[in-house]
Design a protein with these regions (language model features):
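Bacterial N-terminal signal peptides that target proteins for export
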Residues: 1-9
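Bacterial N-terminal signal peptides
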Residues: 9-19
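Sec/Tat signal peptide C-region and signal peptidase I cleavage site
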Residues: 21-24
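Beta-strand-enriched cores of mature, soluble protein domains
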Residues: 26-157
Length: 157
């Protein structure tokens, strides 16, 4: 009888722990992006540094690192920053492969994909944190006439 009671109490305790764990997990995974959302920021690329890794000059394998300020769409106020790196893929095609994190109010948005020297690029939103923890979608990167970059995020849940 005592063994059955001990077993029943242990089973009840495990069930209670499971209920608390499921409730905690479901509360923390509530998506914050529930509809398509846009975010437009402007990067001022003042820290970009190219590291020549092989033959002298622009060659495959060279690295680009950066950590720049992000401004609002009106380009009047700093609203975040980014940090990341790119590897030169093809100098003749003007292509890099990049990944970076954008730090904005409410969380981070990570992107990965190609950067082209002379045309627009579309990168994949690979995830996020905080308000952007369920983010996915794409980011359009466009060079402006002012040696800056428009980052236009199209976020989907």
């Amino acid at each position: 009888m005592r063994t059955r009671l001990t077993f029943a109490l242990a089973l009840a305790a495990l069930a209670a722990i499971a209920v608390v764990a499921v409730a905690s997990a479901s509360g923390s995974s509530t998506p914050l992006i529930t509809t398509a959302t846009s975010l437009h920021v402007i990067e001022h690329p003042v820290t970009d540094t190219v590291i020549d890794t092989g033959a002298k000059g622009d060659t495959s394998g060279d690295l680009l690192t950066f950590h720049n300020k992000l401004y609002n769409a009106a380009n009047t106020k700093v609203i975040g920053r980014d940090q990341g790196s790119c590897i030169r893929i093809s100098p003749s095609a003007g292509s890099w492969e990049c990944m970076w994190t954008n730090f904005v109010a409410g969380g981070h948005i990570t992107v990965e994909g190609p950067f082209f020297d002379t045309r627009d690029s579309v990168l994949t939103i690979t995830g996020g944190t905080g308000n952007y923890r369920n983010a996915r979608g794409q980011m359009l990167l466009h060079a402006t006439a002012h040696a800056q970059f428009d980052f236009k995020f199209s976020l989907i849940p």
